[in-house]
């Protein structure tokens, strides 16, 4: 019996599905484990943070503050109860005191009633006496008013009083005119004195302002001169910085030339060594050494010339560098003379001797080159350090100069602004003083005009009153002359006096 067979792709699909299911289960387990771990770490972080917070000084202080607040509340409550108890005690004492006073008042009511009755009787009798006095005074006034002789005497006195009053009014008017004239003179004198004082103050203020303007102008000129000097100094510092940068570039160029010469020398040595031309090599090597020495001598000569042209700063270090450069120059010149002597000797050597001499001289040259390179490196390094220090000093000086110039410019701007504000204030002050003087003049003129008008009105009123009085007197005299004498009616029969 034949077994059924399954296609290959079906088996592969089933294995792939199983593998995907296992992978998903594994990812789910990993995700669940990751969530558990993250939850654990999150809870541990929360616990540790809370524990740290509870055990921190801030939590301790907060707890102590809460304890102190509760303690203060308890103390306040006890204090409030004590005050309430004290108030209750005071209220009881006050009630007892009021009860005693009420009892005493009730006992003294009868005595007070008797006193009031006695006082009422005294007041009544006093009123009766006062009424009697008033009645007597009224009777006396009535008799005095209705007595003909007294009336004639009063009329004569009134006429005399009127005549005397006219004289008195004339004298008072003259005195008022004199007083007004003196007051006007006093006002004029005060006005002139105030005007002179104001002019003197304005003159003194103008002189003070001119002096301040002069001093301020001198200060501004001095600041402008200082600003110009700072600008010249800044230009000089910029030029010096450019010169120092050129010197540094020159040193770098010289050092690069030495490196190139060294590389060229090494290549030439290799070629000469391969060709085994010892005599020619010795000659060329000698010439090369001479050229190197000559180049080093030129470099040192240039350094010495640069040092002579630079400013006299860092004197001790510069003298040491100059001395080292001079000594190096002298040593190079001596070695140059020695190499020339060696070159003359080489012309007389044989090949084997030249070979031995080559090896010997090569060792000597290597030692000398090493020492010379070391010395040149020290000299160049010192020179570069010196140039770098000068550049830094120049930069700091430029920064200080720039700050100083900016401060001077700000001072100039502030001075100009202050001068402008002061000028405006002076103009406003002058205008205010002028307006004040004009107002005073106008007020004086108005007062004088009002005084004149019042005097004219008073004179006109007096003239009108006098005319009216004369007209009334004349009319009354004419009426009395026409009517004749008429006795005045009285309420009781008048007794004819003999």
From Swiss-Prot:
Stretch list, region Trichohyalin/plectin homology domain: 259-425
InterPro entries, alphabetized: CFAP53/TCHP (IPR043596), TPH_dom (IPR043597)
Subcellular location: Cytoplasm, Cytoskeleton; Cytoplasm; Cell membrane; Mitochondrion
Region span, Interaction with keratin proteins: 73-498
One of the GO biological process terms: apoptotic process
Top-level taxon of the source organism: Eukaryota
Recorded coiled-coil stretches: 11-39, 66-353, 380-479
Region feature (Disordered): 168-191, 386-405, 415-498
PTM summary: Ubiquitinated. Ubiquitination by the BCR(KCTD17) E3 ubiquitin ligase complex results in proteasomal degradation, and induces ciliogenesis.
Composition bias, Basic and acidic residues: 389-405, 415-437
A single cellular component GO annotation: centrosome
Keywords for the protein's UniProt record, in alphabetical order: Apoptosis, Cell membrane, Cilium biogenesis/degradation, Coiled coil, Cytoplasm, Cytoskeleton, Membrane, Mitochondrion, Tumor suppressor, Ubl conjugation
Listed Pfam families: TPH
Family the entry assigns: Belongs to the TCHP family.
Functional note: Tumor suppressor which has the ability to inhibit cell growth and be pro-apoptotic during cell stress. May act as a 'capping' or 'branching' protein for keratin filaments in the cell periphery. May regulate K8/K18 filament and desmosome organization mainly at the apical or peripheral regions of simple epithelial cells. Is a negative regulator of ciliogenesis.
Subunit structure of this chain's protein: Interacts specifically with keratin proteins including, KRT5, KRT6A, KRT8, KRT14, KRT16 and KRT18. Interacts with KCTD17.
PANTHER family: TRICHOPLEIN KERATIN FILAMENT-BINDING PROTEIN, TRICHOPLEIN KERATIN FILAMENT-BINDING PROTEIN FAMILY MEMBER
Protein name (database record): Trichoplein keratin filament-binding protein
Source species: Pongo abelii (Sumatran orangutan)
Taxonomic classification: Eukaryota, Metazoa, Chordata, Craniata, Vertebrata
